[in-house]
Every structure is written in structure tokens, then in C-alpha cells.
UniProtKB/Swiss-Prot annotation, chain B:
GO biological process: protein glycosylation; regulation of response to osmotic stress; response to salt stress
Gene name for this UniProt entry: STT3A
Organism from which the protein derives: Arabidopsis thaliana
Protein name: Dolichyl-diphosphooligosaccharide--protein glycosyltransferase subunit STT3A
Domain of life: Eukaryota
Binding site residues for Mn(2+): D54, D172, E174
Length: 589, 779
């Protein structure tokens, strides 16, 4: 059978977690080789055991310690009292007779530091109590053992005293004890002040969303509670602000989150908006986020908040054997935070296949589908659940999956085709004639009306051209006044004359066409009027032109000519005005 | 003008038309982007969060809607507010906004775009202001052409008055209601211009949406009848008018009655009577016109006498019925808010609760300049432009601006209704002015370029009449104008669009201005526009973006954030029992229910004056009496807002007189005079003992003196009157970081000891509390 030749136990209670480190030297003094080793804890500790790892360390040198953890499972308690919990450790190789093995055991317990008194006022200090055994509880005989408890650097209210108990500074030592029977037990109680933040996340949901566009988005929802002694009575802000140290020592204001390096787009908010009290420091090694909840947390007070950050994909996603794997830490980045219920959801991109997860410790696994940005099939979500998580669980997990890069393009293509279809429908809708009945009177009337409008536009453009020719005529007159070249002027008149005639020829069929439509009955008189007016204007202009040219031929003075054409000029202006009015009227149709 | 000069018919004109259309669509899209993005200052400077008070309620309702669905929403009885009465939310809320946002959220989520309800709510207002500016374009286009439409849309996109109610996060009814208002008006004008029943039906639907969205729909249902009446009186009756009006009244009223909050009010209250009266009148007029058409003039005269006599009788009967109806209802059939519109002094006389809201006060002159800025100067020009020529549509906008100016003068909140009218008017004014000036410039430049060598012409820019005929439309001149227009930004880029161009030409002929004058005037107009833009951006960024639940102050060592409200709401929501009741003044009711999820006694929906008065009475009573009132209401926590430490002026001490007034209005033992020293409201050593012993005073200043030793109140700028006192019936449970919110818990009643119980009894029977106990229905 086994004998523990030497046991050293160190309990660290400087934070809210009691972290126990044990060095066990196991000797097989029996005749058969042994391949299993039993670890026992008192039940009240065993129930609160959050983390347990056992590693063999060969030799005494510190550097030689191997990091291979041995597999640990909860063993059934055959013939043992209920007040003991047992874990069995599979040894790396069977321990044959007379062999020695050194085991390093790390165990973390939550909720073992009981606040006492359970309710304190704002001004009182926060005292907690630790119960342990001065002697190592073991199914094996122990030859030599010692216990040291590292207390926070503060007041120590009381502790159980035995003859070989020593208090050195903030370190309390029990032992050494020699040659004790198996299952020897001597309870001790340490009552001391704790300044640590008793921050407990009742529930933490971490969503890790992988985007192959280059980002891993982490969103963490915390329900945090202060699990220390509850606050009783008033909370006075005055006292808290004026004398924060005695009057608020039991509260914590800050939490420090140590995020991976190159974390970006960090936010800190709760369900009613952004929380502005946070501070970030970052360098190439790490990103430190100091967050302050909306209010200082006293014992029993709760709060809720969300932290989110993006991480570069290249730091976390790797490829191996045709598969990709995400290598990311499991627990919360907040230091010294105990999580009662941790749910990690790894959201993989749409179209991932063959998903498998490896974790360094047992977790509950399941899979879900999440629909996010324009998903059709949905994204596979790996859900990992674990209760009672301590910072020691902050180890990397690996999620393996297969993903083809073509899937990346599906959503942009979908968007593009969506817009494409939208525009195409718009084009078709505006171009196509989608009236139901092609023979209904309203449809025919509409067609007719379209024709009328087209004709009107033609008429308009011809009249405009006429007007433009008129302008040319006027221009030629001005040239005349400058150069005195009568011949060119006459030529201009001739050309415009013929041009105008052509135009009026063009107008005629249009007019007839317009009159043939019943729906244009209220327009055609106006159009006719326009044409008549235009004709008149033509004549007037010609007359004026002739007069001016004649005047120049007769070499009469400019003033004289002007006097002669003055009346004509007025009429021209009036006519022109009328034509423009008519044009405007037609235009408004 | 381009279209008119095109040498070939057909293609170039069509091309230019298309170009103009594409350009105006592009400009409209840009206006939409502008309207959306100018409202994002609050998100950029602060955060994406719901603002102020009412938006929190709407947000909460939207959350409920998105979680539980529409049927649950209609039947929702909210037990988190007005404890112990509760409130039937489905039947007392204008559902337009929540349904809109809920639908958007649902649509996005069914497309798998996972936006939170909060995000949708925050951005609903900016999105709808883009819609509103497009609706303004449509409306103004119907009135004065697309040029004016674009100008008006651009102005509306950034008018500060509208920004103040529609920045991102300001999730209030007005955000969608202004869009609905303008769109309803547009459809009315469109129906009036086309006489199409299709648009008339759409108009009724738009009106329905407006009724769903905002109580301000009564503005529509009174303005449109007034316009119809105006048209009839000025002899502008036409079948189009009938089509525009009659379906609206019938369909609109039926649809409005479908909205639970309106229900039978749509036919019963006086706000709607004008529409029915005009409905009768328009039928009479239609009949008269019809008879006039089928009868000879002689017969018609006979008929007129007949009809008039019968009509008089009918009218008399109807009027008698109306009068009887109006007289039978207690407030004369008018709601308090409507009455205070008709008689601005009504609220302050009779309903202190309406008067106590700052947005129900009349505005000051500077607020006009602040809210509509240069538009105030452009509006008269726009009105003049509307009169030349006066059409049905332009007479409508004139009526609209006149009415809205009156209403905005009564209540500062209705400045919002004025803003679109002012934008439309200013858009018309600007567009006409630009037409005139650019027309003149073009004409002048055309003239000079045409005769650059002509010595005579260079000197004579003023002999306009002669050049008039010959000048103008050479290609060169046009090119110059086009170049300029492209430089001068979008307001003039629409110039190539052919429609207003002809008008411009007419104008040009009528009013040709000298080149220098028009250039200077143009520059001045552009400067005016620039000032407007600068002011709007400033207003959006500085004045109207603060969410009011987060305050910031700029000090020497950087930006300081005061997030006290959310700090204490978060505390309440996480550290009190879910069914605890929190009493506070009604301003904070909506926020407490939405952010802290705790039951409140009164909230911002001030429907029960007595209940509010009870809380007001408690706040103004001494501690013991207040404790009894609160205890009778199951209150566990009392929340007060206190700004004395950091100088936050809108705290409860400054609102205290309203609590006294409202409380005193129902419980007469609270007298305003008891709280005033010689008519002055003060909290220093001169204050009255009633004041110094009131619960509000004590809860605000509890242990305040210990902060600086003197108790100097930074808001009132004085030392407080009573410095050292203890609370016997309340205990402080939470005070926020800057002391802005203080939460107190009611101490449990003490066990009765024989002697003490007697003593207590004698005290209460003599003190104020017994009175309040009698009056207070909850005791």
C-alpha cells in the first residue's frame, strides 16, 4: 500500500478563491504495483472544488516539473463516510514496489471563505473565515507534513492555535506533524480581514463569433454580484466619498480585464447604454481594460454589464490537416473573477462542417444554430457550459471545423443580386406597358394623349426654331449696323425666309394631326393661335428687316431708321411676348 | 432653357429631361442623406441611446410589442405604472410610432439582420426625417414646381426646430408624425390638383397614419376644412375640391375611429366638428353648382331661394344639435390642450399640470430665431410668391403657415408644425429669387456675349427693352449659365430641368435686374443659405443632441460625464426587489419603468391629476405625513433629483412649486403661500418652516451640509436654510456619484409601544397628516 512520505500544503487566501497547492511524495510500501491514487477532501471543501489538477513532478528540481496533467475523476465512496469526497488519479505508470513519485496538486475552492459576520454596515471591515484541517486528510498514512496559509496583509481576527502553530507576518504555519494515521483530521478556523473583491459572475455568457473576413468578435455578458458580507443599513455617498477607506472598504469599484493583445473596438455597456467609466491601456503584449461598474458594489449588490471586443483572426485561427481550428481561451478575461455558470458560444461561419471541440477539462457540449446577418442556413454554434469556473480554467480550447472560402462570397453576392434584381424590376416597370386591358377606352385615350403630347412637343420645337431664326435675322441687322454690308444682310434674309417657309410647311401636317384628336380639342385652338401669331411675327420681322435694309440703302441716318421701325418694334415685342406665353401654356400641358 | 434651344427635336430634349430627372433624384437622395446624417451628432458625440423622457416610454412599448406581438400589445394592461391603478397601454397610446418601429424591426429580423430594438428605435427618427424632406419636396412641387420643392426639401432636412425633435435617439411621436403630416398635406394637394380618387384614398390612409402617430392630427382635420371653406368662399369650388375633401372626411373619420386611443372621439369631440360642418357645406355648394348646371338662370334663381330657405333650416338644426352636444360635455367638448391653444391663458388658469410642462409654454422671440433661423425672414417673401399667381395649392400653404404661426405662438412645442410650413415658404421664396437673379444674369451675359464687339452694347447694359428681343438664348449664354450653375451648388443645378425655365424667362422679361445687382443679390442669398447651414449644423451638434440622461461638461481637465441617472436606475433595477414601488415626481416615471423596470406611482402620461397631486402632496408634506401617504401607496423607495452639488438646474427643488400647486389643487391643506416668503421662493435661512420641513427639502439636502461644511447650493446660489437634521422615517439607500439622484427607503413602521402609540395618535389628529389622510383616497 501507499504511504505519503512527505506532504507540503500551501493555501493562498489572498483573493476570494482558496487556492491549495500540495506537494505529495508517494511511496509504494506494499507488495503490488499501484496505478491509481486517491485524493480526498472534507466534503464541505470538496463540494466547492472548482479546479483540480494533478501533475507528476520527477526529481526535486523546479525546472523538471512536467506539465502533463493526469486524468482525475470523481471516485465512488466505497466504505467511506459521507463527509469525505474522493477523487482518483490515474498515475502515469503503475508505481511498482518501493518506487517513489512526487505529485503536484493544485486545487481551487470557491465559497470557502465565509463572510463572518454575514452582514456589515458601510463602515465595518470585511471579515471572512476559513475552515480547514491542520492535518492532511488522506486515505494513506503520512510520515511528515506541514501546512502554511498565506493570508492577506491585513488584520487577523483569530485563528486556531496548536502548539506548533506559527504566525509569521501574514503567513500562518501549522506543523510539521510526523507519522500520522490515515484519515487524521484536526479542524482549524482562521478569521481574518479580506480586502479582496468578492466578485462573482452568477452567469457569464461569452459569445465568440468567427468571421473569416478577419475578425473574431467576443461579446461577454456578465451578471456580477459581490459575494462578500452583505451591506446592512444606509449607503451614504458622503461617507463613501469623504472617507472611502474605512467607509467603503468592503466595496469594490473596479474590475481589471486582461484582454488578448491587439484587441480592438472595445466597448463596455449595459442594457441601458454605454458605461463611460472605463480605462484602457494596451501594448504589444496585452490589453488591459479597467472597468468600473455604474456604482460601487457593496456586499450583496448586483450589476450587469457587457464587454465586447474584436480580435484579429490571424492570432486565433490556425489550420491543420485540412481543418481549421480556433484556439481561444475558455474563461473570462477579468482577473480574480469566479464564474458560477459559464456559457461559451462559439459561432462559426455559415457553412462550417465537421465541428469538433477539444477542451483541457470536462465541459458540457451542445450545438445550436444562430441566424445572423443575412444568413440562410444559419451559423453553427458550439455551446460549452461549465459551472464554477475560476481563473485557473483560463486555458485554451480548440474548435476544429472545415470551411471553404467560397462560402465567404455568398452573402456579398446575395446583396449584389438583390440590388440587381431591384434595379432590373425598376427598369422593367418603367419600360413595360403593364396595363391589363389593351382595348379599354381609358387605355386608348392614354395612348392618344401620348401622341398628342409628342406632336405638341414637335410643334413646340419647330416654333422654337422659328424664333431662333428670327433671332438670326435680328443678328444680321446688328451686323448691318456695324459693317454696313447690305448684301450679306439681304442674303441672310433670303435664307431665313426659305428656312421659315420650310418650317411652316412642317408645321401644317402636325396641326392637322392635332385637330383630328378629340382629346386635344382644348389645346388645338391655342396651338393654332400660336402658329398664327408666329406667322404674324414673321411678317412683322420681315417688314422691319426690309425697312432697315432699305434705310441703309438710302443711307438715311440711324436715328431715322430707328424712328421708322419703332412702331414695328413694339408690335414685335408684344407678339413675341404672346408667343412665349402660349409656349409656356403648352409647356405646362 | 436647354430644352427650348435644342436644334433637333426629340432626343436632346428627352435626354435633357432625363438628365434633369436623374439630377433631381440624385439631389433628393443627397438631401435624404443630409437629413439622416445631420441627426447623428447625438450618436457620435454621446452614444446610441434613447433620449429624454417620453422616448423611454415609447421604447418600452416597442420592446413589449416586439416581444409579445401585436394582439398582446392591444390588450396590454401595464401594472408597472400608476400603481395601484395601472394603465391600459393599448388603448391610451398613439400606436403609430411603435408599430412603425416594430414593423421595421420585424422586417429586418426576418431578413436575418440582427438589429436590436433599441437600435431601430434610435434611428427611426432620422430615417423618418429623410422621408419628411422627400414629402416636403413632393408637396412644394405640387405648389410651385420642382425647383421650389428641392429648395424646401433641403431646408427642411436641416431645420433646427425639426432636428430638436428628431435627432437619433429622440424616439418620439413627432418623429414620424411630421412626415405623416406633410405627406397627408401633399396627398391632399395632389388630389386637389388632379381630382383623382386614387390619391383621395391614399390621402385618407395617410391621414389614418397621422391619427395613429400623434394627437396633432387635429391640426390636419381643422386645417383642411378651413382651406376648403376658403376655396368655397373665394369662389374656387370645383369637383376636384369635392373629391379632395369628401372622401377624406368619410374614410378618414372611419379609419380614425379604428385607433383605440381616438375611438368615438373622432365623431364626438369638438376638435372634429369643423370638418363635419364643412362637409355639409361642401355638399350644399356641390348641389348648388349641379343645379346651376342643369337649370336655366331664371329657374336657378327660384331654386336658390328654395334651397337657401331649406338649407337655413337644416343648418339651424345641425348647429343646434352641435351646440347642445358641446354644451352637454363638461369641458365644452374640447380637451385641455386644445383649449389652451384657443385660449393661451386657459392652462395656467385651470390646469397647472399642463402649464407645468415647459414645452407647453409660449415661445420667446429668440426661440424663433433659434428654431427656424433665416427662414423667419424668407417666409414673407414666400407668401408673396404664393400670391402670384394664387392657386388652390398655394392658398393652402399660405393658410398653413398662418395657422401654424399662431399655434407656435401659443405653445413652444408646436414650433414643430411651423417648421415645415416655414421651409416650404422659404423654399418657394429662395427658388423664385434664384430664378429671377440667375435669369437676369443669364440674360445680361447672353446680351453682352452676343455683341462682344459691339461698342454700343458694352456701354449700355441698361437699355434692356431693346435688347430684350434679340438677346438671350444663344448657346454661348446658356453655357455660361450652366457653368455657373454647376459651380453654385445644387440649388441651381436644377435650373436645366426644363419646367421652371419658361417661368424664369417670363420673370426675366418682367423683372430684368442689372447684372451687378443680381450677382450681388445672388451672393447675398448664397451667404444667407450658408449662414442657415452653419446655424443648423451648430444647433444639431451643440443645442439639440444632448440625450439629457447623460450630461457632459467641458472643464479644463477635459470632458466630464455625469451619468448619474443611469447609475441610479441601474442600481434600482439590480438591487431592489422586482415588485418594489418607487415614488418620484412624474417626470422620472417613464425612465424608471423603462430603465429600472420598477413600478412607479405616477409617470409622464399625466392622465390622473389626483394621483399626481397625491405624490405632490407627499413631497410637500412633513416627513411623517409623507411617510403615511407613501406607505399607503405601498411605496418602498423615494427618488429625488438634486442638482445642488454640481449645479444641475432642472432638479426637484426647482420643480417643487409645481408639486405644491398641483398637490394644492386637489388637497387644499397644501397652500402655495406657506412655501413662499413674501411671494418669493427660497430655500435659505429666510425660507418658511413649512418649506424647510417638507419632505422634498429634507430628502434633497439630507447630510448635504457635510460636503462643504456650509451647505452651499450651486443651483440656487445660496446656503441652505436648515443644515443639520436627521431623517426618522426614511433612510438613504443610494446616492449617485454626483448626488444628482438620491434614493431613500421608507423605514418599516416601528413596533407600537403603549405610551408612544398614544402620543403618535394625538399628534396625527392635530397635525396636517390627518387631513391628508382624509383627503387622500389611498389612506
Amino acid at each position: 500500500d501507499l504511504v505519503l512520505s512527505k506532504v507540503e500544503r500551501r493555501i493562498d487566501v489572498t483573493s476570494q478563491i482558496a487556492r491549495v497547492t500540495k506537494t505529495l511524495k508517494v511511496v509504494n510500501s506494499g507488495s503490488e504495483s499501484v496505478s491509481e491514487f486517491a485524493l480526498t477532501f472534507p466534503k464541505f471543501l470538496g463540494n466547492n472544488l472548482a479546479y483540480l489538477s494533478v501533475a507528476p513532478s520527477e526529481g526535486k528540481g523546479k525546472s523538471k516539473r512536467t506539465l502533463v496533467n493526469l486524468s482525475v475523476r470523481e471516485a465512488d465512496q466505497k466504505g467511506l463516510p459521507d463527509s469525505i469526497s474522493v477523487y482518483s488519479v490515474a498515475l502515469p505508470k503503475p508505481l511498482s514496489k518501493g518506487d517513489t513519485l512526487t505529485l503536484e496538486v493544485v486545487a481551487a475552492f470557491t465559497n470557502v471563505l465565509q463572510p463572518f459576520p454575514e452582514k456589515i454596515t458601510q463602515g465595518e471591515i470585511h471579515l471572512v473565515m476559513l475552515q480547514e484541517s491542520a492535518q492532511y486528510l488522506s486515505p494513506y498514512a503520512v510520515e511528515s507534513q506541514s501546512l502554511s496559509i498565506k493570508l492577506p496583509n491585513a488584520r487577523i481576527e483569530s485563528y486556531t492555535k496548536f502548539e506548533n502553530t506559527k504566525l509569521q507576518g501574514s503567513e500562518l504555519k501549522y506543523g510539521p506533524y510526523k507519522n500520522l494515521q490515515s484519515y487524521s483530521y484536526s479542524p482549524i478556523v482562521v478569521h481574518f480581514e479580506s480586502k479582496a473583491a468578492f466578485a462573482v459572475a452568477e452567469k457569464l455568457v461569452r459569445e465568440i463569433e468567427v468571421s473569416h473576413w478577419g475578425n473574431v468578435q467576443v461579446t461577454e455578458n456578465y451578471n456580477v454580484v459581490h459575494r462578500g458580507a452583505q451591506l446592512k443599513g444606509e449607503f451614504s455617498r458622503l461617507d463613501f466619498q469623504a472617507r472611502p477607506n474605512p467607509r467603503g472598504a468592503s466595496a469594490f469599484r473596479h474590475l481589471l480585464a486582461r484582454l488578448p493583445p491587439r484587441a480592438h473596438s472595445i466597448y463596455y455597456r449595459d442594457d441601458i447604454g454605454n458605461i463611460s467609466t472605463s480605462e484602457m491601456k494596451s501594448d504589444s503584449k496585452k490589453t488591459e481594460l479597467l472597468i468600473e461598474p455604474r456604482f460601487p458594489l457593496f456586499g450583496g449588490w448586483k450589476t450587469f454589464f457587457t464587454i465586447g471586443y474584436g480580435l484579429p483572426l490571424t492570432d486565433f485561427l490556425f489550420a491543420s490537416e485540412g481543418k481549421r481550428f480556433l484556439n481561444i481561451s475558455f474563461g473570462s478575461p477579468i482577473l480574480d473573477l469566479v464564474t458560477e455558470k459559464l456559457i461559451v458560444q462559439v459561432v462559426l461561419p455559415e457553412g462550417s462542417k465537421d465541428i469538433s471541440v477539444t477542451t483541457p477539462f470536462a465541459v458540457k457540449q451542445s450545438q445550436e444554430i444562430k441566424y445572423s446577418h443575412l444568413d440562410i442556413a444559419g451559423r453553427p454554434v458550439v455551446v460549452l457550459e461549465k459551472n464554477n469556473v475560476v481563473p485557473d480554467h483560463n486555458q485554451h480550447i480548440q474548435v476544429y471545423y472545415k470551411f471553404s472560402n467560397i462560402n465567404l462570397l455568398s452573402e456579398p453576392l446575395m446583396l449584389i443580386s438583390g440590388f440587381f434584381i431591384l434595379f432590373i424590376t425598376c427598369i422593367i416597370y418603367t419600360r413595360a406597358d403593364i396595363s391589363i386591358s389593351k382595348s379599354s377606352p381609358s387605355y386608348l385615350a392614354k395612348l392618344q394623349w401620348d401622341e398628342v403630347l409628342a406632336t405638341l412637343q414637335e410643334v413646340q420645337s419647330i416654333v422654337q426654331k422659328c424664333l431662333a431664326t428670327h433671332d438670326k435675322l435680328e443678328a444680321s441687322l446688328r451686323d448691318l449696323s456695324r459693317t454696313g454690308d447690305i448684301q450679306t444682310c439681304k442674303a441672310a434674309r433670303k435664307s431665313t425666309d426659305s428656312l421659315l417657309k420650310d418650317l411652316s410647311k412642317e408645321l401644317k401636317p402636325l396641326l392637322g394631326f392635332l385637330q383630328s384628336f378629340p382629346s386635344a380639342s382644348h389645346i388645338s385652338p391655342k396651338v393654332e393661335e400660336l402658329v398664327v401669331k408666329e406667322k404674324e411675327l414673321q411678317e412683322k420681322l420681315m417688314a422691319k428687316h426690309t425697312t432697315v435694309v432699305e434705310g441703309y440703302e438710302k443711307k438715311s441716318s440711324g436715328r431715322d431708321i430707328e424712328n421708322r421701325i419703332a412702331s414695328q418694334q413694339q408690335k414685335i415685342i408684344a407678339l413675341r411676348q404672346e408667343i412665349e406665353d402660349l409656349l409656356e401654356f403648352i409647356d405646362e400641358i | 432653357m436647354a430644352a427650348l434651344e435644342s436644334p433637333l427635336p426629340g432626343t436632346p430634349t428627352a435626354m435633357r429631361n432625363a438628365f434633369g430627372n436623374v439630377l433631381s433624384v440624385l439631389i433628393l437622395v443627397l438631401i435624404g442623406v443630409l437629413a439622416f446624417s445631420i441627426r447623428l451628432f447625438s450618436v457620435i458625440k454621446y452614444e446610441s441611446v434613447i433620449h429624454e423622457f417620453d422616448p423611454y416610454f415609447n421604447y418600452r412599448v416597442t420592446q413589449f410589442l416586439s416581444k409579445n406581438g401585436i394582439y398582446e400589445f392591444w390588450n396590454w394592461f401595464d401594472d408597472r405604472t400608476w400603481y395601484p391603478l395601472g394603465r391600459v397601454i393599448g388603448g391610451t397610446v398613439y400606436p403609430g410610432l411603435t408599430l412603425t418601429a416594430g414593423t421595421i424591426w420585424w422586417g429586418l429580423n426576418s431578413l436575418n439582420i440582427p438589429l436590436s430594438v433599441e437600435t431601430v428605435c434610435v434611428f427611426t427618427a432620422p430615417v423618418f426625417s429623410a422621408f419628411a424632406s422627400w414629402a416636403t419636396y413632393l408637396l412644394t412641387k405640387e405648389v410651385k414646381g420642382s425647383g421650389a420643392g428641392l429648395a424646401a426639401a433641403a431646408l427642411l432636412a436641416m431645420v433646427p426646430s425639426y432636428i430638436s425633435r428628431s435627432v437619433a435617439g429622440s424616439y418620439d411621436n413627432e418623429a414620424v408624425a411630421i412626415f405623416a403630416l406633410i405627406f397627408t398635406f401633399y396627398l391632399y394637394i395632389k388630389t386637389l390638383n388632379t381630382g383623382s380618387l386614387f390619391y383621395a384614398t391614399l390621402n385618407a390612409l395617410a391621414y389614418f397614419y397621422m391619427v395613429c402617430s400623434w394627437g396633432g392630427y387635429t391640426f390636419i382635420i381643422n386645417l383642411i376644412p378651413m382651406h376648403v371653406l376658403l376655396c368655397i368662399v373665394t369662389g374656387r369650388y370645383s369637383p376636384r375640391l369635392y373629391i379632395a375633401y369628401a372622401p377624406l372626411v368619410v374614410l378618414g373619420t372611419l379609419l380614425a375611429a379604428l385607433v383605440p386611443v381616438v375611438g368615438f372621439n373622432a365623431v364626438l369631440t369638438s376638435e372634429h366638428f369643423a370638418s363635419f360642418l364643412v362637409f355639409i357645406i361642401i355638399h350644399v355648394v356641390a348641389l348648388v353648382y349641379y343645379i346651376k348646371g342643369i337649370l336655366s338662370p331664371k329657374m336657378f334663381k327660384v331654386a336658390v331661394t328654395l334651397v337657401v330657405s331649406i338649407g337655413m333650416v337644416v343648418c339651424f338644426i345641425v348647429v343646434a344639435i352641435l351646440v347642445a352636444l358641446v354644451a352637454s360635455s363638461p369641458t365644452g367638448g374640447w380637451s385641455g390642450r386644445s383649449l389652451s391653444l384657443l385660449d393661451p391663458t386657459y392652462a395656467s388658469k385651470y390646469i397647472p399640470i399642463i402649464a407645468s410642462v415647459s414645452e407647453h409654454q409660449p415661445p420667446t422671440w429668440p426661440s424663433y430665431f433659434m428654431d427656424i433661423n433665416v427662414l423667419a425672414f424668407l417666409v414673407p417673401a414666400g407668401i408673396i410668391a404664393c400670391f402670384s399667381p394664387l392657386s388652390d395649392a398655394s392658398s393652402f400653404v399660405v393658410l398653413y403657415i398662418v395657422m401654424s404661426v399662431y399655434f407656435s405662438g401659443v405653445m413652444v412645442r408646436l414650433m414643430l408644425v411651423l417648421a415645415p410650413a416655414a421651409c416650404i415658404m422659404s423654399g418657394i421664396a429662395l427658388s423664385q429669387a434664384f430664378d429671377v437673379f440667375t435669369g437676369s444674369i443669364k440674360y445680361q451675359l447672353g446680351a453682352s456675349s452676343n455683341s462682344t464687339d459691339d461698342a454700343e452694347d458694352n456701354t449700355s447694359t441698361n437699355n434692356a427693352p431693346k435688347d430684350d428681343v434679340s438677346a438671350g438664348k444663344t448657346d454661348k449664354g446658356e453655357e455660361i449659365v450652366k457653368e455657373r450653375s454647376s459651380k453654385k451648388g445644387k440649388k441651381k443645378e436644377r435650373e436645366p430641368a426644363d419646367k421652371p425655365s419658361v417661368k424664369a424667362k417670363i420673370k426675366k422679361k418682367a423683372l430684368v435686374l442689372p447684372l451687378e445687382a443680381s450677382i450681388v443679390a445672388l451672393l447675398l442669398l448664397i451667404m444667407l443659405g450658408a449662414f442657415y447651414v452653419i446655424h443648423c449644423v451648430w444647433a444639431a451638434a451643440e443645442a439639440y443632441s444632448a440625450p439629457s440622461i447623460v450630461l457632459t461638461s467641458q472643464s479644463r481637465d477635459g470632458l466630464h460625464v455625469f451619468d448619474d441617472f443611469r447609475e441610479s436606475y441601474a442600481w434600482l433595477s439590480h438591487n431592489t426587489d422586482v415588485d418594489d414601488k418607487v415614488a418620484s415626481w412624474w417626470d422620472y416615471g417613464y425612465q424608471t419603468t423603462a430603465m429600472a423596470n420598477r413600478t412607479v406611482i405616477v409617470d409622464n402620461n399625466t392622465w390622473n391629476n389626483t394621483h399626481i397631486a397625491t405624490v405632490g402632496t407627499a413631497m410637500s408634506s412633513p416627513e411623517k405625513a409623507a411617510w403615511e401617504i407613501f406607505n399607503s401607496l405601498d411605496v418602498k423607495y423615494v427618488l429625488v433629483v438634486f442638482g445642488g452639488l454640481i449645479g444641475y438646474p432642472s432638479d426637484d427643488i426647482n420643480k417643487f412649486l409645481w408639486m405644491v400647486r398641483i398637490g394644492g389643487g386637489v388637497f387644499p391643506h397644501i397652500k402655495e403661500a406657506d412655501y413662499l416668503r413674501d411671494g418669493q421662493y427660497r430655500i435659505d435661512s429666510e425660507a418658511t418652516p413649512t418649506m424647510l420641513n417638507s419632505l422634498m427639502y429634507k430628502l434633497s439636502y439630507y447630510r448635504f451640509v457635510e460636503t462643504d461644511g456650509k451647505g452651499y447650493d450651486r443651483v440656487r446660489r445660496t446656503e441652505i436654510g436648515k443644515k443639520h437634521f436627521k431623517l426618522t422615517h426614511f433612510e438613504e439607500v443610494f446616492t449617485s456619484h454626483h448626488w444628482m439622484v438620491r434614493l431613500y427607503k421608507l423605514k418599516p413602521p416601528r413596533n407600537r409601544i403603549r405610551g408612544k402609540a398614544k402620543k403618535l395618535k394625538s399628534k396625527t389628529s392635530s397635525g396636517l397628516s390627518s387631513k391628508s389622510a382624509k383627503k387622500n383616497p389611498w389612506v
